[in-house]
Design a protein with these regions (language model features):
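Conserved glycine-rich FAD pyrophosphate-binding loop
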Residues: 1-136
Length: 136
């Protein structure tokens, strides 16, 4: 199963490819890409997209990675974070674990509004379990 067309095409040739989602550091994109290219070579291939964040142009990335285990994946993510990238890890269960790192009351409020019984994607939003703390 894949989330994007780049990973789909790579996995159609070799099932050992996976991907990450990240926002590259503003004004430091090439340093990160060049560092990873030097350290990881062809184990990390780039799919870049231009996005707007609060009116400023940014580069988002969906790099495809040759899967060599969780330790190597974590090392690649740490390399990216050290150089200022924001990682949205698709290899975890919860929204909070994927990138935010904290419970977002606005997301809990939205889930309460659109899924008041919590039937959709149970366990995906960690904040759902502590929704009473938000007085909503």
């Amino acid at each position: 199963m894949v989330w994007n067309h780049t990973t789909l095409h790579m996995r159609s040739k070799d099932k050992n490819w996976t991907y990450l989602q990240m926002l590259l550091p503003q004004n430091n994109e090439l340093e990160l890409i060049n560092f990873l290219r030097k350290k990881w070579g062809k184990k990390v291939l780039w799919h870049l997209e231009a996005v707007s964040q609060q009116g400023s142009p940014r580069l988002a990335a969906l790099p495809v990675l040759k899967w060599n285990g969780i330790d190597e994946l974590n090392e690649i993510m740490e390399d990216c974070k050290k150089l200022g990238a924001v990682i949205f890890n698709p290899h975890v269960l919860t929204v909070e674990g994927g990138g935010l790192g904290v419970v977002d009351a606005d997301q809990v409020k939205a889930k309460l509004r659109f899924d008041p019984k919590g039937l959709l994607n149970p366990g995906k939003l960690a904040g759902w379990e502590i929704k009473e703390q938000f007085n909503i």
